[in-house]
Amino acid sequence: MIDATPEPQKNGKIINWCHVDVGDEYNETDENGNKVPRGIICGAPNMAAGEKVVVTLPGAVLPGDFKIEPRKTYGHISNGMCASERELGLGDNHDGIILLRKYGFTPEEYEKLQPGDDAMHLLHLDQPLLEINITPDRGYAFSYRGVAREYHHSTGAVYTDPATALGKKAPVTQGLPEGAKSDIEVIVDDKNPIHGVVGCDRYYARAVRGFDPASHTPNWMRRRLIRAGMRSISLAVDVTNYVMLDLGQPMHAYDLDKIEGPIVVRRANEGEKLTTLDGKDHDLSVEDLLITDSPNGERGSRVLGIAGVMGGLYGEVTAETKNILLESAHFDQVSIARSARRHKIPSEASRRFERGVDDQLQPAAAQMAAELLVKYGNGEPSEHPTDYNTVCNRRPILFKASEVARVAGLDTDVNTISDILTDIGCTVAGGGNGEFSVTPPSWRPDLNEPCDLVEEVARLVGYDEIPVTVPPAPVEGRVGLTAEQLRKRQVADELAEYGMVETLSYPFVGDEDYKNFALDADATKKVSVEIANPLAGDRPFLRRDIIPTLAQTVQRNLRRGVE
């Protein structure tokens, strides 16, 4: 920034007429053919001569399809724009433009920055992104930790689980000396468990006191959050989100000074409401699992958030928060999935909880978050966290090595099978006569039956190793599709060419569908086929028209946030 001349306006605003050196390649050319700094209008309050800033030039297109062009404004031709974080999609900060001296560069690195340097490279916006399609059973892969594990399986690269070292550093919660007081009392009072499964079997809470509310998120962390599709909000919130991305454990940060213990995890009562962090009001269902606290001694009377989905406005971390309570919990997958869909909140946390989170990860995640808050926010972590833990040990699976050949057709020796199961984290015992007792790791809730273990062996040996067997063709009779099958396929292909999508839905309807389409339920039932053992008790009839079940599909997709 060569100079910045303040110019008061009639409306009371003060704008700066600036001359900015953007390097000889991008500077303007005067009438004598000399390169001169660009003239740019800027209203940012932190604009000052001598600053090194990020400039977007004419022709650039910013997020929101905002095109940068030379334009006359405030009596000058502004030939570019000095950019803020929000304008570049780097965060929500729009209080001023980006000043590179505050952007994480060392003094030596800052001194080397020259006009004309590529800001995309300086801000690490030019690095490639890896997009991974993760199947619903691979909840652990929704993290750097999980992806690194899969990379190890794929390439043989050395893998060290970061949660192991973090867990060893976490404070001991068992056998505390008499009189030692934990951070806050936690009670789980689930009177309406879904399918008999209590909604929360582990709740780990740890306080960090003396946090500096003026501390900023380090730029490396902000970059990683943004590149993962998340917004940078504040250090405390960013730390919990980063731990989730890194380890796979969703977390929540509360303002400890606003929380009154005990914390009670319970189901919602009829008629309760909640305003979530995004400012939306929600009518709560009796199936919703809630995090509540106890103001004035009234146990569980104030709702703090929908467990595993989104927190409420009360208790959130603000710019004045000095003491933080970290929540690191394990919730029932079905409870979280239903609440997220019911309230149309497909949050990053709910996506992980509904797929299954490691039930032994909570202390390690809280330890990592505490270390980051100490390093960048000067906080002091508590040594007496609360750990409500009723997690049951995993049931061993009796597994015969011969199942691999029987189910997958792979001729794999016993030692290889044992090595593969051990490598994915299982505890393998036995092996005599080809029989194992296999205990799956805590991060793999999808491994429950012998066939699940066969799938893992086949996946890591390689599906391409499965022998190909061509089914024998019939000796007599017609070969291939019938004329009717060919006609149906041709029609489907033709409609698909016009952009239409085929919908396959269950053909079951009931009273609710008749009511939605103003049909006479009694009359319709008389001419409908009733199923003796329906999949859903409220839809026991076969449809006579496809429209009601198409409507069911649309409704289901909308509930899941699909437009």
Where are these regions (language model features)?
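Terminal amphipathic helices with adjacent charged low-complexity linkers/tails
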Residues: 151-191, 377-404, 410-411
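Glycine/proline-enriched, intrinsically flexible loops and inter-domain linkers
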Residues: 2-8, 16, 155, 160-162, ...
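Self-splicing inteins and homing endonuclease
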Residues: 173-197, 201, 369, 388-397, ...
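Residues forming anionic-ligand binding surfaces in small-molecule and nucleic-acid pockets
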Residues: 112-134, 180-227, 333-353, 397-398, ...
